[in-house]
Amino acid sequence: MFFFFFFFFDETNGKKSKREFDNAKWQKKANKGEWSELYTLYKLLSEQNLYPINIDNINGQRLRMPILSILRHTEQYLKAEYKIEEDGQIVINANGHNIIQIAKSDFDNIAPKLFEAIKKGAPNENGTSDSSFELPEFDEFRRNTCCPNIKCYSKNLGKGEKDKSDLYIVIHDFVTGQTPIQGFSIKSEIGNPPTLLNATDLTNFKYRLSDNLPDEKVAQINSMVDKRGHADIKGRVRAILDQQVSLEFSTINPNAKGEYVFLENLMLVDSMLPQIVSDLLVLSYSEDTRVLSALTDKLSEINPIGFPMKTNKKQYEAKVRRFVTDIALGMVPSAPWEAAHQAYGMLVVNTKGEIDCYHIIYRKSLEDYLYENLKFETPSASRYGFGKIETGPDGCQYFTLNIQLRFMK
């Protein structure tokens, strides 16, 4: 591939800034989801507009948000800004210093090639495709565009919190005339579906058994394994419920300081949300589906909390929608949530290579995408220490489940 790059270092600082990127850790391999993050940058610099999806749009016209610049972090204190000039050319600014200008046509050329390469993957010596692979034919372009890392770097915001935004985009808002900088997370429908909420020790939900089971029954349930020899969490949950014993929500794991951060975060969204999420988690094992929306419908039918639902049957759905949207826009189990969104939406690389933009200005479209495309997933029971009946200091028996949410596509 041949590209024309116009370098215009401001002698001292520009060269120094470029060297910082050249000396940064070079990421050689990545999976399809991570490669999609690099593709998103190049695709947006080619299109130079965002088109937020609005499901309520009936006239077919889409709001256009011109992109003025894109910011991408390589390390905690190393970032590049891709400024789009009036003629469409892109000026790359490294840590405050202009270092290179690249023609828009180069991004027009590279983006579709990168997309096709990501879809194909890279076959290994056995002829199959590894989950992580190299694409060395794009190395030169990556170096010249200050992209030593394939996956976007997540800044450390302190207090155990990572930035949810993969890219920051300065847009021209036609409505207000302002040029705000807005963060976006990136998801990809190429390759394995990504997670929305990752399992950690802090996502363990603890339940009290409504009645203690005999020791021999506890031993039998705790020893249940699946065909692969892993803990059979679904089988264990169903075995407990088959004893006419219910799992009553108790709490969520605290952090090392004894702080119930995730529990309090959920309560900030809605005081009943910890109970609702805990009930959904149990249903995800006792029912034959793991789809979030279907389980929420089932929970609404059961109505365990006893909401008045004669005139409004969306009590559970509305709260679950808020939960997944806040997770997508910034809430994490490890850091206090103040309902201040870090991200303004999601950029989804679809199977055609288009960038679907779900923006908070069309919140319902964003909520619909999340609510209709998520499922519960079982993380490693041995790694996160859940899935066994244990007796607490109070003599009651307890059982722990861990929550992880993954996109279905």
Give the positions of each predicted feature.
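Hydrophobic alpha-helical signal peptides and transmembrane signal-/tail-anchor segments
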Residues: 1-7
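Short, positively charged
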Residues: 8-164, 170-409
